[in-house]
């Protein structure tokens, strides 16, 4: 099957006509980091390795005049001469610039090999768009030291697929280029569901995935995610192995370091009292869950801090921690992008576990503002208590 490529109201310039004339096929200006719409399809032709972004509504049986048309299964086809031999493309010469690149081969390719042989490109990660993430797709950062994706729910790995485009970043302010060689092909690998997940690594990490409550209940896709990697004596500043964040159409979760927004950050081992802030924006739902996996976080206890509720939730090491929260767009503090962070405390200062059946608060509700708390079996000399109403307000 084929798909509609739109960009005019009357079908000129090789486009399918739509009432709005809105474009659906785009290129990317690497030097200026800006998308631009393709101006025609009757003169321009596809070139192996040249990347595009295309909105896929479905195959050509759908009605493009209706926004509510149901999507259909679509197969993209291209014809032409196969690209063989070395394929080199010059890229932006500005440090940290995102460069849109395409796999020129009709074969799976190992991006570790590609970037190792390229010039002045960051070899630590690359970025792909996964249409299976969230409801409209989301950017995924692949850590090339492990092949692991962030968010972790993606099937993306270090192997770029035939026909797939991706982003890489320029390392320093100097000439940069990407080189694909025949020896980069990974013919023994299987296709991923992005267009097999790698084994998870065994270092100290905190993987934070965001999911709507509905998607969580129905085993759906992640909305977005971020990854913290902890390595002894690593720098807490911004370096090449820290992956900048690409913003999504919908929910976007970033790690904040100074003025930098990251999808992966490599840091020194966590210290007591250290705070790592997050930036979470573009809420599309009201009810969410964080799925936070800690691996080998030793010597400290990590807490998820919720500034809106005034809570600190301890995170269990080497387990998945599922934490529900909700937002209300009418409440600015509720949807504040800086609402959440992670902090660390001495793991020896463990909180006493309280059986909820031994706890009572009455009268509830109270009309006088006074109430009694009863806690059976507690030997504590002093207790600090925070009380919240049904809306989550303290």
What residues fall within each predicted segment?
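Compositionally biased Ser/Thr/Gly- and acidic/asparagine-rich
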Residues: 1-394
């Amino acid at each position: 099957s084929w798909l509609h490529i739109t960009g005019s109201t009357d079908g000129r310039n090789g486009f399918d006509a739509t009432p709005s004339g809105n474009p659906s096929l785009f290129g990317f200006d690497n030097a200026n980091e800006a998308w631009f719409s393709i101006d025609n399809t009757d003169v321009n032709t596809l070139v192996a390795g040249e990347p595009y972004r295309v909105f896929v509504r479905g195959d050509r049986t759908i009605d493009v005049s209706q926004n509510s048309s149901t999507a259909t299964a679509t197969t993209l086809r291209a014809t032409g001469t196969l690209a063989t031999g070395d394929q080199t493309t010059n890229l932006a010469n500005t440090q940290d610039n995102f460069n849109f690149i395409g796999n020129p081969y009709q074969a799976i390719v190992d991006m570790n090999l590609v970037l190792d042989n390229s010039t002045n490109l960051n070899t630590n990660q690359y970025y792909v768009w996964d249409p299976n993430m969230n409801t409209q797709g989301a950017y995924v950062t692949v850590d090339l030291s492990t092949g692991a994706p962030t968010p972790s729910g993606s099937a993306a790995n270090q192997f770029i697929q035939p026909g797939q485009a991706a982003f890489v970043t320029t390392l320093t302010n100097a000439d940069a280029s990407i080189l694909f060689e025949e020896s980069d092909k990974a013919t023994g690998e299987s296709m991923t569901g992005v267009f097999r997940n790698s084994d998870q690594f065994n270092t100290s990490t905190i993987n934070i995935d965001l999911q709507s409550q509905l998607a969580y209940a129905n085993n759906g896709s992640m909305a977005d995610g971020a990854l913290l990697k902890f390595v002894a004596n690593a720098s807490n500043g911004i370096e090449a192995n820290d992956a900048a964040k690409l913003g999504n159409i919908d929910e976007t979760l970033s790690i904040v370091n100074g003025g930098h927004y990251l999808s992966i950050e490599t840091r020194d081992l966590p210290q007591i009292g250290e705070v790592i802030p997050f930036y979470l924006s573009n809420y599309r739902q009201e009810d969410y869950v964080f799925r936070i996996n800690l691996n080998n976080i030793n010597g400290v206890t990590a807490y998820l801090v919720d500034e809106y509720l005034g809570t600190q939730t301890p995170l269990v090491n080497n387990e998945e921690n599922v934490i529900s929260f909700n937002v209300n767009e009418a409440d600015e503090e509720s949807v504040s992008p800086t609402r959440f962070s992670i902090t660390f405390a001495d793991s020896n200062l463990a909180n006493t576990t309280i059986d909820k059946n031994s706890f009572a608060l009455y009268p509830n509700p109270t009309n006088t503002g006074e109430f009694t708390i009863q806690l059976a079996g507690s030997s504590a000399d002093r207790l600090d208590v925070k009380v919240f109403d049904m809306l989550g307000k303290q």
